[in-house]
Swiss-Prot record:
Source taxonomy: Eukaryota, Metazoa, Chordata, Craniata, Vertebrata
InterPro entries membership: Yif1_fam
Organism from which the protein derives: Homo sapiens (Human)
Side of membrane Cytoplasmic, spans: 2-138, 196-203, 250-271
This protein's UniProt keywords: Acetylation, Endoplasmic reticulum, ER-Golgi transport, Golgi apparatus, Membrane, Phosphoprotein, Protein transport, Transmembrane, Transmembrane helix, Transport
Protein name per Swiss-Prot or TrEMBL: Protein YIF1A
Domain of life per record: Eukaryota
Disordered: annotated segments: 1-33
Residues with Phosphoserine modification: 12
């Protein structure tokens, strides 16, 4: 009996194994795919094969090596030209700021009328960095203010349903072009007036870039309170920036050696400083009026 029961169990196992699979409900149309569970293609294997084939291609390897060498050579050339035309140590001076300096400088730009001493402080014939001297110009605030202005302009255009990448790019490029033109005009004016001072291109770029702070406040006030608030903020920030520019550039632009010079030259240098200050409200208005409606 045990023999027959065992034989029956063994035979049932063979019959279970030999039982045909039920016919599929649908015909297999995935002729181009490999036989994976569920009928999905072997994407991992195909990608691995493609990558291995690409890496094994001699032409691809040559192209990758050539592109890498060009990128490395271009990077070296950029660093070389940057060190040639721009002193990195001098550039670091204009970014030597801290949180306390940024807060105080922003307050000085908005309300400069109570500030008394406007002379740049020196230590061993070298100017102190901005974080140690509130009167020292910096490029950190102008850079961050420019980025904030571009973002705020995009938000203002989006609120007015006028946003597009082209319009935002035009706003950013126009703001940069105006600052560059202003710096070039100041350099030309200083050259024609034969002014000997410690002002460099970085100094002029910093003083010209401080207008972005007033532009941000004007646009933000206009978005919150309408056109009336915009014009009030524009008048306040423009007058504050004009006062700041005149007091900051007066000693540096006139130069200590020009005090005993001819009177016409002193007047020309003074007119140059006043002209640079008077030009600020026009630029602020031109770059912000279309953002507030």
């Amino acid at each position: 009996m045990a023999y027959h029961s065992g034989y029956g169990a063994h035979g049932s196992k063979h019959r279970a194994r030999a039982a045909p699979d039920p016919p599929p409900l649908f015909d297999d149309t995935s002729g181009g795919y490999s036989s994976q569970p569920g009928g999905y293609p072997a994407t991992g294997a195909d990608v691995a094969f493609s990558v291995n084939h690409l890496l094994g291609d001699p032409m691809a390897n040559v192209a990758m090596a050539y592109g890498s060498s060009i990128a490395s050579h271009g990077k070296d050339m950029v660093h070389k030209e940057l060190h040639r035309f721009v002193s990195v140590s001098k550039l670091k001076y204009f970014f030597a700021v801290d949180t306390a300096y940024v807060a105080k400088k922003l307050g000085l730009l908005v309300f400069p009328y109570t500030h008394q001493n406007w002379e740049v402080q020196y230590s061993r014939d070298a100017p102190l960095p901005p974080r140690q001297d509130l009167n020292a110009p910096d490029l950190y605030i102008p850079t961050m203010a420019f980025i904030t202005y571009v973002l705020l302009a995009g938000m203002a255009l989006g609120i007015q349903k006028r946003f597009s990448p082209e319009v935002l790019g035009l706003c950013a490029s126009t703001a940069l072009v105006w600052v560059v033109m202003e710096v070039l005009a100041l350099l030309l004016g200083l050259y024609l007036a034969t002014v000997r001072s410690d002002l460099s291109t970085f100094h002029l770029l910093a003083y010209s870039g401080y207008k972005y702070v007033g532009m941000i406040l004007s646009v933000l006030t206009g978005l919150l309170f309408g056109s009336d608030g915009y014009y009030v903020a524009l008048a306040w920030t423009s007058s504050a920036l004009m006062y700041f520019i005149v007091r900051s550039l007066r000693t540096a632009a006139l130069g200590p050696d020009s005090m005993g010079g001819p009177v016409p030259r002193q007047r020309l240098q003074l007119y140059l400083t006043l002209g640079a200050a008077a030009f600020q409200p026009l630029i602020i208005y031109w770059l912000t009026f279309h953002l507030v409606r």
